[in-house]
Amino acid sequence: MDLWQLLLTLAVAGSSDAFSGSEATPAFFVRASQSLQILYPGLETNSSGNLKFTKCRSPELETFSCHWTDGANHSLQSPGSVQMFYIRRDIQEWKECPDYVSAGENSCYFNSSYTSVWTPYCIKLTSNGGIVDHKCFSVEDIVQPDPPVGLNWTLLNISLTEIHADILVKWEPPPNTDVKMGWIILEYELHYKELNETQWKMMDPLLVTSVPMYSLRLDKEYEVRVRTRQRNTEKYGKFSEVLLITFPQMNPSACEEDFQFPWFLIIIFGILGLTVTLFLLIFSKQQRIKMLILPPVPVPKIKGIDPDLLKEGKLEEVNTILAIHDNYKHEFYNDDSWVEFIELDIDDPDEKTEGSDTDRLLSNDHEKSLSIFGAKDDDSGRTSCYEPDILETDFHVSDMCDGTSEVAQPQRLKGEADILCLDQKNQNNSPSNDAAPASQQPSVILVEENKPRPLPIGGTESTHQAVHTQLSNPSSLANIDFYAQVSDITPAGNVVLSPGQKNKTGNPQCDTHPEVVTPSQADFIVDSAYFCEVDAKKYIALAPDVEAESHIEPSFNQEDIYITTESLTTTAGRSGTAENVPSSEIPVPDYTSIHIVQSPQGLVLNATALPLPDKEFLSSCGYVSTDQLNKIMP
């Protein structure tokens, strides 16, 4: 019973671990040795001897044989010195090797009668009664077929270039294997190489006995060999005899393809050459390439302006050039209005009870408003119309005697004279007017568009008080149009007025000429070495009337100066003619400009220039020295 347990253990171990030739799986041998030693305590290994099993092999799965090495101190010449014993499952005792001769020297051959497939075997090698080596295996695990036989080849095809050829290699299975009956299934592996080479090339395993070989060179010789193994095992048998393949001699011209053109070197050198050429091209044309890839940003240019002026910072010249164009105007050339905006509130009933606009215009506040240096800035945070820089600029222009302001001055004097004329007629009818003779020639201070410019004449204080008395007279104010409808306000600060009515009472216009309000001959306070030609013309024109009423002779500070006057004698001749021209009706101005905003509902308007009766005063302002003025005076 113990023997059968041992055989069962060996069978289970042999199913998982295969015994191969001269070496067995160590785990399998260990388990088998331990089992044998348990069953047979006398089975021991003689470690001092050199005898051992080399391999056990079955060529066809029907028979097998085992081989061992001969020790240095042992020889088969001494019968019974070395023995091999075996045991299997169906035999319950150890038996000696059945054939020591058929398999060769130091071997034991088991024919088909002693071979059982799928049955575990255990063998031991003894020398002089001691166990030298032992192992266990199964027959199907030690199969190593014999080499194939009948190896040959057949030419299949030759290429059109007569350089390559295809062949078919055939062989026969080992003669001792029953492949046809299916007792054993073999796999074949073919190796080939060129003659004089050392490394064999291997093809994939095949189950057939033939394999094609493609693209073999006709000018080469090849060697072919084949070996086989049982399917699903790893151990191959021996190689067959080497088959030498030699193709028939071909035309020598067909072997010209042996010379392989060095395409690889040409490609490498070509890439290097192109790289060097590209670098040289980039280096030589780097500026142009840079402009193509990164075009320069165009320099900003203004037509008609030299860029050097902008670089050097000459802004005055740039502004002068830009001022030529209509779409550009320097900030100093803009017409600054006195008031940038007007805030009107006509819905406040409390403001109506404070007084009429006429009283507000003719009150003392109006006279005080002429002193614009003390005016308060009420423009709600906007740029003040009374800033010093604007005032200095305007007064400077007026002091330099702008031609436009001098031309408009006689018109304003004439318009105010008409107003005073109406007032004088009303005063002549009252008893209080007898004390104020008309020959006093009052001087009226008009509000010019740029600045107040009073004419310095004799008796200024007395005439100013008389005029103030006349303007504050309610009877005289009833006949004057102090109101006009505002139809529009221009962006420059001008007010567009609707045409007003003439005298409401129908009184005839005063025949008094504008000479009443024209400045008389008086002492001229000469602040500089010259004064305006327009003042000289006015003085000459009024000289005859003034001499009859004034006893003050003009006196001038004499200085050596240059003269830039024109047409003084002509002006003196024309002055008499201008006096005889009858005064026509003064048209009501359609436009005026705002001078001062006294309250949300009160406006102080500038005197508007009226049409000139004489075109001669449109000439530019000239300068007259005091010496020449004394000479031309009558």
Curated annotation (Swiss-Prot):
The soluble form (GHBP) is produced by phorbol ester-promoted proteolytic cleavage at the cell surface (shedding) by ADAM17/TACE. Shedding is inhibited by growth hormone (GH) binding to the receptor probably due to a conformational change in GHR rendering the receptor inaccessible to ADAM17. Glycans are attached at residues 46, 73, 111, 152, 157, 196. The keyword Ribonucleoprotein does not apply. It holds the Pfam family GHBP. Residues 290-375 are annotated as: Required for JAK2 binding. The modification Phosphoserine is found at residue 337. Residues 19-260 are extracellular. This is Growth hormone receptor. The lineage of its organism: Eukaryota, Metazoa, Chordata, Craniata, Vertebrata. The gene is GHR.
